[in-house]
Structure formats: structure tokens, C-alpha cells
Amino acid sequence: MATFYQFVYRGVHNMATYILVDTANTFFRARHVVRGDIDTKVGMAMHITLNSVKKAWQDFSGTHVVFCLEGRSWRKDFYEPYKRNRQVARDKMTVTESEEDTVFWEIFDEFKNFVSDKTNCTVMRHKQLEADDLIAGWVQAHPNDKHVIISTDGDFAQLIAPNVTQYSGIQDLTITHEGYFDKKGNPVIDKKTKEVKPAPDPEFMLFEKCMRGDTSDNVFSAYPGVRKKGTKNKVGLIEAYADKESKGYNWNNMMLQRWTDHEGVEHRVLDDYSRNVVLCDLTAQPADIRTIIDDTINEATDNPKEIAQVGMRLMKFCAKWDMQRIADQAQYYAEPLQARYIK
């Protein structure tokens, strides 16, 4: 019997279905799911990452898995404050927290080496790219296929489409162009409105993000304090967005506004918005970065891996990290890991 999620994709069974893993996001977010010692947290991170892949593979009839990894990011050169807050947070870690973080990165490298060397999954990384760039690039390079993005990152909302879904194994939440669904396939209820959470509007969500900035990535707002819905005397995001294509009064009224920051520097909204588009829009990277994205994907897929006995290799990996629950169902976990990329 087909699952709920397979019904979402009715009529497009001839397409390939790629499971695209935001690897570091999934692995490191999983550490916060359980309390306990470092071994417990590492075990949970491994389990949730592999289980997310297995579940997405089964629910969406996957055909190939792609693990996307982080580089330093070109955005730090384009915009100096980008993710500077992450380093500030690391500098504030206690000795115990710092040691735990180091161990997690070491284990993550072990996991990365396993999927790179012992499975047929495509694994992509470039020193200048973030996983977001590679995931978006893969979707854009395979427009006639289906894609399931495994991540908790809200940045992927802009990619949601009839052929692109996002799944969080940590929250057991699925986001499609039709709405937000829990693990049973039921629509998610918005905690504020007490009503069904409306389906995402990718284009407006991206516009709002470029206007408001992103505190988690230290991307500053283009227009601090801007309202979503305007008032009688002031244009809001909704009105400006509706006027985006025609570039009429409401658009210009907002974009030509000026404001002064805490250091006395004057900003024009349009200038900061344009900067944020380059930082946030996963179709708007600079031309040289777009070339790197394309080249990285082509290099990763030119010679698809042909690794044999992936199931046995998984069993050895499970034994090394004491993952008995996964070892007991190794055939189900191995299936997505042994599927080759077909050109």
C-alpha cells in the first residue's frame, strides 16, 4: 500500500527521486535531541542521520542519496559579518563544551569517510561552498526529477515546489508545496492561530528573508522594523511584494527609504536588500560561484561509484560505533546506501 507521501507525488513515478542530505545540519542538530554523555549524543546523531535517510527513502521511493557537505563559504568574503556570530558562540564555550564539539567533529569526519568510501552515495563538497549551494544546484541541475531535502534549515523553503519536498528527521516533519505534515501525514496545526498551517509561499518567504535578514547567519536586515502588512501611512512587505514585478509606487516607496544604523551609517533599503538577495537567494550566487557549483556537481557524477557489499560495510561500521538497532535491520538501511547514481 502506498504511503501518504507517495500519494503527494502521484503521476510522476517515471522521475528519479534524489534524497539530498544537509549532512552537518542533520548530524549536529541531532546531538540536542537527547541528554546524556558524549557517547549517547554521538550514537543519537548517527542513528537520526541514518534513520532519516532510510525513512525518506522508503516514504518517497528514493532512487539515489546525495550527501552535501560544508566548505568555508564564499559568503564570508562577499559579506564580512556573515556567520561571525557562530565564532563568537564557539569562543564562549566552556572547556567541556569545546571538548564535546571537537569529538563531534571527529566522529562526523568518520561518518563522512564512511559514506564517501564505503557506499555508492554521491558525496559533494567544495572549499568555497555551503551545503545549501550544492543542494540547490543539484535541484536546478535535475529539473525533471523529484527531490527530498533532509534538513531542519528554513533556508530551503525557497526551493519547495511540486517536485521538491523537505523532510526533518529530527522533528519528523514534512514540508511540501501543499502544506506541512506530521509523521502520520496529518496537516500541522499552527500554535498561534490554532488552524492548519498554510502551505509555504516560497517566493514571498524568500523576499521576506532578504528584507528582514537572518539572525542565525548574522545577515542584517535591509529595513529594520519593517511591518509585514502596511498601515495607512506606511507600505509593508505584503504591499511591496505585490508591486515587485511592476516596480510601482509601493515597491519604490519601500526600497528608496533610508535609515541610519547604531554607528551612524546611512543605509538605503534597496542596496541592503540587493546584498541580501546575493546572500540568501539560492539562484542568485555570483557567476563564478555558479560555475563552481556546476563543476562540483559534474565532477561528483561523471564517474558514479560502484562499491560492492555495502551491506557488509555498513555492518562493520555499526559494530565499530555500537549501533545494534541499525545492524539488526541492516538490509533496510543499506538499500539507500548501495543505490548508484544513474546518468
Language-model regions, residue ranges each:
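Generic N-terminal initiation segments characterized by hydrophobic and/or small/turn-forming residues
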Residues: 1-4, 203
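Short, Lys/Arg-enriched N-terminal segments with co-localized hydrophobic residues
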Residues: 3-14
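Non-catalytic nucleic-acid-binding/docking modules located in mid-to-C-terminal regions
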Residues: 16, 55, 59-69, 84-92, ...
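Noncatalytic, basic helical substrate-engagement surface that gates or grips nucleic-acid strands
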Residues: 16-150, 156-181, 189, 281, ...
